[in-house]
Design a protein with these regions (language model features):
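Activation segment signature within eukaryotic-like protein kinase domains
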Residues: 31-32
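Conserved catalytic-loop aspartate of Hanks-type protein kinases
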Residues: 109
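AlphaC helix of the protein kinase catalytic domain
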Residues: 14-23
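Conserved activation segment of eukaryotic-like protein kinases, specifically the C-terminal portion
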Residues: 84-94
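Conserved short submotifs of the Hanks-type protein kinase catalytic core
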Residues: 1-12
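Catalytic-loop of the protein kinase fold
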Residues: 43-59
Length: 139
């Protein structure tokens, strides 16, 4: 058995943000537009991504993005009101309904898209705190 992976020499958006601190509006618009198209495609195939963050978005040699790490994705989500009570995701990117242990659906991906846009323009997630309890309260 062989595992073939695409090499992305330009790294991920987490690395790019660490280097640049934030993106200009034009670059943020391009990246967000491509992530939006990727999410639309996933949702059309009934996939809820659930772990959208800069570290899970790779850059290719032409400046376009690729989503990676589908480990937290949920298949066969055919409704925006899918009942999933799983507590999954990265702390600074968790949607309020996940923290409240409520059922959630594909809408958590759209929440994460907003968090991502904020981070691209400001340089950190909107409710970021080093203390986990404070972070959760802010969300």
């Amino acid at each position: 058995m062989f595992l073939v992976l695409e090499y992305k020499e330009f790294g991920d958006l987490g690395q790019a943000l660490a280097k640049e601190r934030l993106f200009g509006e034009e670059l943020a618009r391009i990246y967000i537009s491509e992530v939006l198209l990727a999410l639309e495609y996933l949702h059309s195939k009934n996939v809820m991504y659930r772990d959208l963050k800069p570290d899970n978005i790779m850059l290719d040699g032409t400046g376009h993005i690729r989503l990676i790490d589908f480990g937290l994705s949920k298949l066969n989500v055919d409704s925006d009101n899918y009942s999933s009570g799983s507590f999954l995701g990265s702390h600074a990117y968790l949607a309020p309904e996940i923290l409240a242990s409520k059922s959630y659906g594909k809408s958590v991906d759209w929440y994460n898209l907003g968090v991502l846009l904020y981070e691209f323009l400001v340089g950190q997630p909107p409710y970021y705190k080093n203390d986990l309890e404070e972070l959760y309260q802010n969300i």
